[in-house]
Amino acid sequence: MKWFNLKNYSFLFVMALAVAACGSDDNDSQGGSGEGQKEPNVNRNTAYTDAAATRIEVPHLQEGNSRFIVYRTNDKTFDKDGVNYCVEWDKDLKANRWSCYILTSRNVQGNEQRWSGGYADYYRSYRETETSKKSVYFFDLTNLSLDDYYHYDDNGATHCYIHKAKGFDHGHLCNSNDRTYNSGNGVGEINKQTFYLTNMQPQYSAFNGSQKVNGKNSGIWLTMEKFVNSFPKSNKFAANDTLFVCKGGTIDRADQILTRIDGKLIVPKYFYAALVWKRTNSNIYSGIAFWFEHTSVNHGSDALKGYAISISELEKKLGNKIDFFCNLPDNIEKKVEKTAATLDFGL
């Protein structure tokens, strides 16, 4: 009988397990889902009514009176679950906590025009120069009630508190320009959904870029938006890569609230963006975050790199209230949140 060296075979078996543990099956193709992963993940979303809560771009959901809202379309060309973007809305604070979505080299392309209003299937809100019954920004009354918003009535219409007369613009979180691909249903539904008031925060025009400097729109938030939109179009970004995006404003701490419009609607003192880039072919992840003070002074010409921080630092600035990218396996999440990968992102 031939005897085998069990010690050597045990060593090979342990090595095989170690090699297997270096990879991760996070199953995020065309939709960012974190389901199916084999690596430990103790802080992932487990209490939810919509499976979209397991997507990589979705932070850990808050308890209490917060509502997780998923905006979908019937088109699954760019997302296997038809997810456009997701929102967490705090019904007590009556404010958006964050909006999150994915960008790929495919869904960032398109020629869909910016939504300009005119459909009667949405609840009419305020438009600064509007004289007709067309509208641009909408209350989502499918997922929320009108009482879940701060609103007021005037001239037979219900309005939100974000408008120039109050000193602020509608600040998109899921950017309209990030949703220009056509859903094929003929009404631009994908872009139109970004105009829900659940996806808005009040922003100074000098901050969000509606202010013009030397004839061009300028603002540090716009600078960040352009960077996020252009990155999946760059040579760095491969066809199967995914950029996971989460943006928001500070609403949870009194010292991080700039003011309240008419004593009601929160105006964040800071805004942020958190990004994770997955190179699908090599299963490599890179992370970066941006932190901006919300000010009426125009900083549109500033270098974006000066606002870059790690995702871990962003979480600390937010008082650890938000756990970003919690659906990533713990080992990947820890590594990707540790440093701001400015070189990887070309900053």
Regions found by a protein language model. Name each.
Residues 23-347:
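Domain-level detector for secreted/extracellular nuclease and nuclease-toxin modules, and
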